[in-house]
UniProtKB/Swiss-Prot annotation:
Phylogenetic placement of the source organism: Bacteria, Pseudomonadati, Pseudomonadota, Gammaproteobacteria, Enterobacterales
Membrane topology: Multi-pass membrane protein
One BP term from GO: protein secretion by the type III secretion system
Keywords of this entry: Bacterial flagellum biogenesis, Bacterial flagellum protein export, Cell inner membrane, Cell membrane, Membrane, Protein transport, Transmembrane, Transmembrane helix, Transport
Basic and acidic residues composition-biased segments: 8-25
Stretches the record annotates as Disordered: 1-25
Segments on the Cytoplasmic side according to the record's topology features: 53-73, 116-144, 211-382
InterPro entries: FlhB, T3SS_substrate_exporter, T3SS_substrate_exporter_C
Gene: flhB
Superkingdom: Bacteria
Main location: membrane
GO cellular component, one term: bacterial-type flagellum
The protein, known as: Flagellar biosynthetic protein FlhB
Annotated transmembrane regions: 32-52, 74-94, 95-115, 145-165, 190-210
Length: 382
């Protein structure tokens, strides 16, 4: 039993995932962020490399141009430096903006947007060096190390192959004008970066899968955890059973309180009792105010006798009413004729009690459709 509760072999429930999300525990892939940043850099160089090269060449020329008129004036020197910095910022603004935007958006692509203050709260347990030492030799750390080694080998191989293949072209840059050389250099850098991106895409895909798998594995639950969560979110089954029992008892008390209002109680002496009420000025059809089987039926009869409610033994009708009529609801239309005969007998019985004479004969052979009777079914004793 203890082994079952200790082994976290079950997938996390939606509630567990949502709770972890609220605590800031979501899958993250640094490799995905790096890839997107690299893509932004490649795009800027590929589509705006010539413009960037020209602006950087202009800055380089301006920085290497010495004007004797400003050498002895510190204010002019400072102004020149500020101008160069501004030109550099404007030249690199597309690249910087793209990198910042990707750095903000890329984490949302995998784990979604989460604002959690719990991850910012200080945890003094992190000051304990033992967990840190354990993490250094964990499988997660080993996987990260292996991934870093493979990434270094892959990027180094792609870059080395590119430099070897384009070495003559790179050497010719020294013979070109600065602006032309800068533009061609940007093209080479963009092509090299594009090859690196294509090379690391499979690794990034594997890393995304690995991070999601590791996240779900870390949130795995034992069967006992799932049972405890069910008790907390849905309620303890024993408590829920007790609540349902109390609700049934309260409903039964309300039902018994309505028995004295009934006009007649129809009985199957062996099992069932159904109390009916009809007010021709307020109701379009008779309704059931109480019904029960077994001990409940016996209690309905006792309350009816204490309040002088007429009773009629009509087993088929009692069974049909018990099965097909609900408490507080009107009786089914198929039973109108049978109940009408019963109510007519009740009206005659009231007149007899007031005026005397010959006692009315109880109706027999009431017209109850066979489809509504269930004579062979055993009742549930409530």
């Amino acid at each position: 039993m203890s082994d079952e509760s200790d082994d976290k072999t079950e997938a996390p429930t939606p509630h567990r995932l949502e709770k972890a999300r609220e605590e800031g525990q979501i899958p993250r892939s640094r490799e995905l962020t790096s890839l997107l940043i690299l893509l932004v850099g490649v795009s800027v160089i590929w589509f705006g490399g010539v413009s960037l090269a020209r602006r950087l060449s202009g800055m380089l020329s301006a920085g290497l141009h010495f004007d004797h008129s400003i050498i002895n004036d510190p204010n002019l020197i400072l102004g020149q430096i500020i101008l160069l910095i501004r030109e550099a910022m404007l030249a690199l603004l597309p690249l910087i903006s793209g990198v910042v935007l990707v750095a903000l958006i890329s984490p949302v692509m995998l784990g979604g947007l989460v604002f959690s203050g719990k991850s910012l709260q200080p945890k003094f347990s992190k000051l304990n060096p033992l967990p840190g030492i354990k993490r250094m030799f964990s499988a997660q750390t080993g996987a990260e190390l292996l991934k870093a080694i493979l990434k270094t080998i892959l990027v180094g191989s792609v870059t080395g192959f590119f430099l070897w293949h384009h070495w003559p072209q790179m050497m010719r840059l020294m013979a070109e004008s600065p602006i032309t050389a800068m533009g061609n250099a940007m093209d080479l850098v963009g092509l090299c970066a594009l090859l690196v991106v294509l090379g690391v895409i499979p690794m990034v895909g594997f890393d995304v899968f690995f991070q999601i798998f590791s996240h779900l594995k870390k949130l795995r639950m034992s069967r006992q955890d799932i049972r405890d969560e069910f008790k907390q979110s849905e309620g303890d089954p024993h408590v829920k059973g007790r609540i349902r029992q109390m609700q049934r008892a309260a409903a039964r008390r309300r039902m018994m309180a309505d028995v004295p209002k009934a006009d007649v109680i129809v009985n199957n002496p062996t099992h069932y009792s159904v109390a009916l009420q009809y007010d021709e000025n307020k109701m379009s059809a008779p309704k059931v105010v109480a019904k029960g089987a077994g001990l409940v039926a016996l209690r309905i009869r006792e309350i009816g006798a204490e309040n002088n409610v007429p009773t009629l033994e009509a087993p088929p009708l009692a069974r049909a009413l018990y099965r097909h009529a609900e408490i507080g609801q009107q009786i089914p239309g198929q039973l109108y004729a049978a109940v009408a005969e019963v109510l007519a007998w009740v009206w005659q019985l009231k007149r007899w009690r007031l005026a005397g004479g010959q006692r009315p004969v109880q109706p027999t052979h009431l017209p109850v459709p066979e489809a509504l009777d269930f004579i062979n079914e055993k009742p549930t004793h409530e």
